[in-house]
Amino acid sequence: MKNEKIVVLYGGDSPEREVSLKSGKAVLDSLISQGYDAVGVDASGKELVAKLLELKPDKCFVALHGEDGENGRVSALLEMLEIKHTSSSMKSSVITMDKMISKEILMHYRMPTPMAKFLTDKLVAEDEISFPVAVKPSSGGSSIATFKVKSIQELKHAYEEASKYGEVMIEQWVTGKEITVAIVNDEVYSSVWIEPQNEFYDYESKYSGKSIYHSPSGLCEQKELEVRQLAKKAYDLLGCSGHARVDFIYDDRGNFYIMEINSSPGMTDNSLSPKSAAAEGVDFDSFVKRIIEQAQ
């Protein structure tokens, strides 16, 4: 309802702060243009609780990315204050933030996802790894410190960089098309095919504006149905709610591999979730409205 007070949470202190600021501004501008009583709050620093208690919002649109918005702390705070919000629960956010935990759950339920394990100093010193592999922080987003590694020499450098952001995982490299699907509760949107500027969809490819996006993705009807069903099943298995996005690799044999689930996807002009919705005929303002109206 438009007479409800809405706070858009953005910014924060994670490495994805700048992206979050852009997402938050886009969402806030959209809400205000549609007549909502909305204000933005930068979640940086230690004043968030005080700000929320002062503003007393009915709902929060969570446009935080990385640790600040996706590790469960903000969800826990909002749930404690009994404020409806657009992201997943604390428990689900903790799970989806940690790519290894997510993978273990998906593999337990025989969902298609590349094999992975934690990367340690000892493993870096071994030469039994079958290259190429992906090396990335176990927790994090926007493909920050994510590398395609083709040799033991590259592995050492990738490990050093990724370990700056916490525990590091090494993952089987799967070659194929990068596909993503946005979900808002029971609404599963069209798949989007990303042709990255670089060899894979890394940080530069995501935010340079030079990657090519196909929405809809061009999958045949059968494969489109399959990827949507896989996305929704992964979303449900990890206990997601509200707005989330599921990323895949689609190989040349027609197999989909679930790469990760993002519980607080970007909402910038260049972000994938709005493209997924647009392929269904849902423009940005309508998409924002659907997300906030379904806040839980």
Curated annotation (Swiss-Prot):
Its EC number is 6.3.2.4. Mg(2+) 2 binds at residues 260, 262. Its main location: cytoplasm. GO terms for molecular function: ATP binding; D-alanine-D-alanine ligase activity; metal ion binding. Binds 2 magnesium or manganese ions per subunit. ATP binds at residues 129-180. Belongs to the D-alanine--D-alanine ligase family. HAMAP family: Dala_Dala_lig (MF_00047). Cell wall formation. This is D-alanine--D-alanine ligase. The lineage of its organism: Bacteria, Pseudomonadati, Pseudomonadota, Gammaproteobacteria, Thiotrichales. The gene is ddl.
